UniProtKB/Swiss-Prot annotation:
PROSITE patterns: TYR_PHOSPHATASE_1 (PS00383), TYR_PHOSPHATASE_2 (PS50056), TYR_PHOSPHATASE_PTP (PS50055). The active site is at C231. The modification N-acetylmethionine is found at M1. Changing D199A: Abolishes enzyme activity. GO terms for cellular component: cell projection; cytoplasm; cytosol; focal adhesion; nucleoplasm; nucleus; podosome. Residues 345-438 are annotated as: Interaction with TGFB1I1. This is Tyrosine-protein phosphatase non-receptor type 12. The gene is PTPN12. GO terms for biological process: cellular response to epidermal growth factor stimulus; negative regulation of ERBB signaling pathway; negative regulation of platelet-derived growth factor receptor-beta signaling pathway; peptidyl-tyrosine dephosphorylation; protein dephosphorylation; regulation of epidermal growth factor receptor signaling pathway; tissue regeneration. It comes from Homo sapiens.
Length: 780
């Protein structure tokens, strides 16, 4: 058990001891009675004999006839003087932390034992004398004055001469500097005289006692020579000071035993000096004083721990500067900061060291911005989240020219004036690149086995942020993919950002150009030549997919390997073919809605390998309808994927959708037959909030808002043959999911309608707020 836990347990035990039992006595009184019974047993049964103190020649040297030194631990005097040649003095050694003779517990000198007292001081090279009583207490002589007063002439106790060189008055005690001379040799020693400790009682405050003991240990830190402690009898107050100092030395050495308790300590002391800690009040004082020492030590531990953390941060900053000069490659980060991780961005090896978190929030969504205006995805999480490292961009070269992940960002941006207010809100949320891939995940997530050569092992999620009507401009025709393609191509699952331009179209660079062109430098702009159209581009150097126009009524299948697609289209029906990916874990990747952006670093369960090593694909077609509805954000804990992926939605909920069963049609694999229409529930129209309870009472309000929005929409309108019994006006995203063609009611999906602008941010939902309240900025 660590020292901190031991100290806390002792403090709690002392606090519990103050509570009285059924007899009205607290634990202090009960424990002290046990100590007294043990001492009586020692005396009556002669367990620790006191034969030397009982001798006739030594009886007169004892201040109290019942307080005699134990023979096995008594201090023996060997220094002879002409007047005194006996070896007896009423004193005992008490062992300390480092030796058996750390303390000399003795009675206050009598008039006939002062020379014996100085003999003992000289013989055992004592430097510190602690006196815990007054010379007179309650009209009785408690101790002979064995030192001269400050400013008076030296006192001679032949053959010893004692002078007082200095005296310092402190709270409740004095510090005197004494000069001891014997046979032309002099020694300087110090007397700590505590004057406010009543006999058989305790002082009102023990802070001055602790202060005196602390200062005493500054004068003598070691135990090479004993410290002489005495009061009147050399038992009660003497034993209390010894117990406190002994425990303090243990504490400073970090050697407090796991089962430390004061009872055992004083019981052992009583086997060395008779009646050490003489009263119940003194016994309680020792507990309280030690508990206070432990509390102060705990505070020191906390301060020391904070300093260690600060030093660690400084070391991280220093190593960050060094690593920027000398980059290294490390595939596995250490479990403690500083953690390093190598990444390949545009063919350059870079080492990145996680920095301590900054106070500003993580920007949620990417918007067009000039270079260096805001941090990109490679720096956002590095600067803002120390414990959840950023996603790493990788460029994996293939036989042909590598496709740049951000090749579609190289075009200039033009913003329409009518959407300036919306874009300002988007700009406030900073930027985050939508096209990225994760190759590495921090060790703290505990991911499963990764194959870093050819396989993309994370389920990718997307965010869309736009301010004008968006539709899918083109969807590629089916193109068979060879089973030996490089599945690890970095262009997989990359998506083209949705943005706003003057016209209602977005021109996407054809994927054929990405194959034939060299890898351009990473741009900072989005492709915004035309207005409103959204295209999810799944292109790569070897598996580029042509995108035909769906607005002309040509619905086609997307045949791809390890791809996840989202179609935004005005067509009545959109048929997307999703392959059944063959993998060992039988996991099903799915698309998250814009409100449920899946942070790969926040997934509770690690994603497994999504495909075979040979890249074999078993295809299965699934009809996906495009219905007109609002972006659903109903909270639900159900997930349709066999692979558990918990999205890190900013609303902190998963988005659940339901399908409409009333207008179902037979699912057909052909491209001409319309798919079944999804059924919407009131819960799916409620915005995700910090509460799990859906607001059903606002269903009618949402219906009226959506109908008014449908009338105002200028863009494309869904065909009349769409059987939708729910109001239109939202954007419904259909997720391509590895599953049988039929959709269950528990399947997550989001309806799409291109009649509204594709503004799916938290601040702007289809151009106007659709929720019961404005979402707070803390979501981002």
């Amino acid at each position: 058990m660590e020292q901190v836990e031991i100290l806390r347990k002792f403090i709690q035990r002392v606090q519990a001891m103050k509570s009285p039992d059924h007899n009205g006595e607290d634990n202090f009184a009960r424990d002290f009675m046990r100590l007294r019974r043990l001492s009586t047993k020692y005396r009556t049964e002669k367990i620790y004999p006191t034969a030397t103190g009982e001798k006739e020649e030594n009886v007169k040297k004892n201040r109290y006839k019942d307080i005699l030194p134990f023979d096995h631990s008594r201090v023996k005097l060997t220094l002879k003087t002409p007047s005194q040649d006996s070896d007896y003095i009423n004193a005992n050694f008490i062992k300390g932390v480092y030796g058996p003779k750390a303390y000399v517990a003795t009675q206050g000198p009598l008039a006939n034992t002062v020379i014996d007292f100085w003999r003992m001081i000289w013989e055992y090279n004592v430097v510190i004398i602690v006196m815990a009583c007054r010379e007179f207490e309650m009209g009785r002589k408690k101790c002979e004055r064995y030192w001269p007063l400050y400013g008076e002439d030296p006192i001679t106790f032949a053959p010893f001469k004692i002078s007082c060189e200095d005296e310092q008055a402190r709270t409740d005690y004095f510090i005197r500097t004494l000069l001891l001379e014997f046979q032309n040799e002099s020694r300087r020693l110090y007397q700590f005289h505590y004057v406010n400790w009543p006999d058989h009682d305790v002082p009102s405050s023990f802070d001055s006692i602790l202060d005196m003991i602390s200062l005493m240990r500054k004068y003598q830190e070691h135990e090479d020579v004993p410290i002489c402690i005495h009061c009147s009898a050399g038992c009660g107050r003497t034993g209390a000071i010894c117990a406190i100092d002994y425990t303090w030395n243990l504490l400073k050495a970090g050697k407090i035993p796991e089962e430390f308790n004061v009872f055992n300590l004083i019981q052992e002391m009583r086997t060395q000096r008779h009646s050490a800690v003489q009263t119940k009040e003194q016994y309680e004082l020792v507990h309280r004083a030690i508990a206070q020492l432990f509390e102060k030590q705990l505070q020191l531990y906390e301060i020391h721990g904070a300093q260690k953390i600060a030093d660690g941060v400084n070391e991280i900053n220093t190593e960050n500067m060094v690593s920027s000069i000398e980059p290294e490659k490390q595939d596995s980060p250490p479990p403690k900061p500083p953690r390093t991780r190598s990444c390949l961005v545009e063919g350059d090896a870079k080492e990145e060291i996680l920095q301590p978190p900054e106070p500003h929030p993580v920007p949620p969504i990417l918007t067009p911005s000039p270079p260096s205006a805001f941090p990109t995805v490679t720096t956002v999480w590095q600067d803002n989240d120390r414990y959840h490292p950023k996603p790493v961009l990788h460029m994996v070269s293939s036989e042909q020219h590598s496709a740049d992940l951000n090749r579609n960002y190289s075009k200039s941006t033009e913003l329409p004036g009518k959407n300036e207010s919306t874009i300002e809100q988007i700009d406030k949320k900073l930027e985050r690149n939508l096209s990225f891939e994760i190759k590495k995940v921090p060790l703290q997530e505990g991911p499963k086995s990764f194959d870093g050569n050819t396989l993309l092992n994370r389920g990718h999620a997307i965010k869309i942020k736009s301010a004008s009507p968006c539709i899918a401009d083109k969807i590629s025709k089916p193109q068979e993919l060879s089973s030996d393609l490089n599945v690890g191509d970095t262009s997989q699952n990359s998506c083209v950002d949705c943005s706003v331009t003057q016209s209602n179209k977005v021109s996407v660079t054809p994927p054929e150009e990405s194959q034939n062109s060299d890898t351009p430098p990473r741009p900072d702009r989005l492709p915004l030549d035309e207005k409103g159209h959204v295209t999810w581009s799944f292109h790569g150097p070897e598996n580029a997919i042509p995108i035909p126009d769906l607005s002309e009524g040509n619905s086609s299948d997307i045949n791809y390997q390890t791809r996840k697609t989202v179609s935004l289209t005005p067509s009545p029906t959109t048929q997307v073919e999703t392959p059944d990916l063959v993998d060992h874990d039988n996991t099903s990747p799915l698309f998250r809605t814009p409100l449920s952006f899946t942070n790969p670093l926040h997934s509770d369960d690690s994603d497994s390998d999504e495909r075979n090593s040979d890249g074999a694909v078993t295809q299965n077609k699934t009809n996906i309808s495009t219905a007109s509805a609002t972006v659903s954000a109903a909270t639900s804990t159900e997930s349709i994927s066999t692979r558990k992926v918990l999205p890190m939605s900013i609303a902190r909920h998963n988005i659940a959708g339901t399908t409409h069963s009333g207008a179902e049609k037979d699912v057909d694999v052909s491209e001409d037959s319309p798919p079944p229409l999804p059924e919407r529930t009131p819960e799916s129209f409620v915005l995700a909030s910090e509460h799990n309870t859906p607001v059903r009472s606002e269903w009618s309000e949402l219906q009226s808002q959506e109908r008014s929005e449908q009338k105002k929409s200028e863009g494309l309108i869904t065909s009349e043959n769409e059987k939708c019994d729910h109001p239109a006006g939202g954007i419904h995203y259909e997720m391509c999911i590895e599953c049988p063609p039929t959709f269950s009611d528990k399947r997550e999906q989001i309806s799409e309608n291109p009649t509204e602008a594709t503004d799916i941010g938290f601040g702007n939902r289809c151009g106007k707020p659709k929720g019961p309240r404005d979402p707070p900025s803390e979501w981002t």
